[in-house]
Every structure is written in structure tokens, then in C-alpha cells.
Amino acid sequence: PWYYMCDDAGIYVMAETNLESHGSFQKLGAIEPSCNVPGSFPQWKGAVIDRAKNNFETFKNHTSILFWSLGNESYAGDDIEAMNVYFAEKQDGRLVHYESAYYNRAYEDTISDLETRMYAKPEDVEKYLNNSPKKPYILCEFMHDMGNSMGGLGSYMKLIDKYDMYHGGFIWDYIDQAIMVKDPVTGKDVLRYGGDFDDKPADYEFSANGIVFADRKEK
């Protein structure tokens, strides 16, 4: 239903292939891709192309989808490039996006039609846009809205009006990930998340990072 709503309302959508493996190349905050998956391992190639095919065949007729994404935070390699070849062969006119080309520039011209980053500062975005940019720029993930944050959103919005090559971004998250339960003491309905149910380990408030509460009320 969501994709049909986007079609009707004119909401722009990027359809992302179900792939994320950042734990295989980001270790304790450092980029160490010696064993990143899928990378260029031939045994993974068929699996990732199958996921790209599933993405394309499921959503290809939705007019709201402007571009395809090869996945999220999975570094780069020949297998990712093979996914891009798959989408290119479909010749449906949509662009292809992949953020992790930023970490391996050897693939930047073969796995993404866009220059795309996560959580880049406004001044870094502007620096790229002022230096003869080859590709449109998108922040595929930014404004992680946890606690008293998101005060810098206006700085990014100003860039949209200033630069034709800046195409905005995707906020993570839109909605808090929480559930409504009845408080045993007060009897009131309250929103709870990781750790509130004595579950260990838990993500705690890390799941409460949306720009609206889980019940869709404004913060």
C-alpha cells in the first residue's frame, strides 16, 4: 500500500536492494575491507544479483520510484558492480545509487550514477558542489534525530535552493521504533523501546531516532 500511496501523492522513492553488510568492513569504526562481503567473492555473486532482480521485478511498475539502490553499507567490489550491470541491462531509464563507492573510488564510475554520502557536514556538501561536480549529490542518510538533535536541518535545506546538483537526502529515521504498552503503575498508555522490557542486550534509545514519535505525533 505504501508504494501505491507514493504513486498517487507524487512522493519520490528510491527502491533499495535488500543488502547490508557493514559489519564485514567497518570494524570498531575503522574501514578494514580485507574480508568484506559480498565484495568480489564469486560465491556471493548469484545471491546479490537475485536480490537485485527481486527488487526490480517487485517495484518496476511504480511511478514513484526514481532510482534503484544496490544496497546499504556493503563497501564495493565486483559483485556490487554486477548488480549495477543487471539494472543497466533493464534500460528502464532510472538512475542507480550506491553510497559505499565513496570508500572505494575504483568503482565510483561503475556502481553509482550519483555522488552519495552519509552524515556529511553542510560545508562538505558545499565543497563538493563548488568543485565542478560530475554527478548529482544526495545524502542517502542524515539527520539521525535522537534526543535533542536535528537543529542543523535548515543548513542542509538552504543548499537545495542554492545548488541544482544537490538533490536533498533521506532522513533516518522518519518514525521512532517503539510500541505502545500500558504502564502497570499509572495505567496510562506509554511508548516503550529496547531495554524497557528487561531485555539484554538492547538498543535502548537508539531506536528512538525519528522526527515523529511512534504514534506519528510531532516531537
Q: Where are each of the predicted segments found?
A:
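Extended substrate-binding grooves/exosites of carbohydrate-active enzymes
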Residues: 1-219
